[in-house]
């Protein structure tokens, strides 16, 4: 698979709590050099990141996260976070569902929350993180149905901050049950170009990772 095609599907991600501005600038530079889909960064850096890339011909999208990583903020707080992120220049928003709400069987409320957040970032891409490692197969299928019915643009496997990240089986399950042309983002544990290819094969259309760009940089430095 063409490496440029893989890179075009990558949200080049840095969400560690100790992240500094120098590190953010570094991933922006890498993302622009290698033409990734976006940089995915903490909301507190969105405005500075957008300004940093503003006059660059090879700028990429800015993605951030809300309700992250637990998802149990109130809907009102998540809506505010989304609106604030868009105001500051975010092009894409990745939200975490209220997992307890899903497990309680309150599917209509999960759907309503997604749509309220999408309304707050209308005209911009919304991805819905369902944290697959905490869900049963039945719950994953229900979330596929909810996201398919919603106004969101993508379903996403994982935050990368829970007990496990994306699996090939989960991406295949999403591909089998998603409808309405929604995208599928795999995130968490994508450690190599081979991993990326294996997630794309069953249906991933976006990849959340920082490692692929690092691997390519290391190969270039080694003369490969």
Language model segments and positions:
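Active-site mouth loops of central-metabolism enzymes
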Residues: 5-21, 63-78, 100-106, 127-139, ...
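Conserved anion-binding
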Residues: 77, 82, 92-152
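Alpha/beta catalytic cores of nucleotide-metabolism and tRNA/nucleoside-modifying enzymes
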Residues: 1-29, 116, 173-184, 190-224
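Active-site cofactor/substrate anionic-group-binding motifs, chiefly glycine-
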Residues: 37-44, 48-92
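Structural motif
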Residues: 34, 88, 120-121, 146, ...
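Glycine-rich phosphate-binding active-site loops on the catalytic face of alpha/beta enzymes
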Residues: 64-68, 87-102, 149-165, 186-224
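Catalytic cores of alpha/beta
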Residues: 50, 70-84, 135-146, 169, ...
């Amino acid at each position: 698979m063409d490496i440029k095609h893989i890179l075009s599907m990558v949200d080049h991600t840095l969400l560690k709590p100790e992240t500094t501005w120098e590190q953010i600038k570094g991933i922006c530079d890498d993302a622009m050099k290698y033409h990734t889909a976006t940089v995915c960064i903490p909301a507190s850096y969105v405005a500075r990141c957008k300004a940093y890339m503003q006059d660059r011909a090879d700028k990429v999208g800015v993605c951030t996260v809300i309700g992250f990583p637990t998802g149990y903020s109130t809907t009102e707080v998540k809506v505010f976070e989304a609106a604030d992120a868009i105001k500051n220049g975010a092009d894409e928003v990745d939200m975490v569902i209220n997992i307890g709400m899903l497990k309680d069987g309150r599917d209509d409320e999960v759907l309503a929350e997604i749509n309220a957040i999408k309304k707050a970032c209308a005209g911009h891409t919304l991805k819905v993180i369902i944290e697959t490692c905490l869900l049963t197969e039945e719950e994953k299928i229900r979330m596929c149905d909810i996201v398919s019915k919603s106004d969101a643009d993508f379903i996403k496997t994982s935050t990368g901050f829970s007990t496990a990240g994306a699996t090939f089986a989960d991406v295949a399950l999403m591909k089998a049950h998603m409808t309405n042309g929604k995208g599928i983002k795999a995130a968490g544990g994508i450690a190599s170009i081979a991993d990326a290819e294996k997630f794309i094969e069953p249906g991933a259309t976006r990849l959340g990772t920082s490692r692929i760009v690092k691997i390519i940089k290391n190969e270039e430095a080694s003369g490969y």
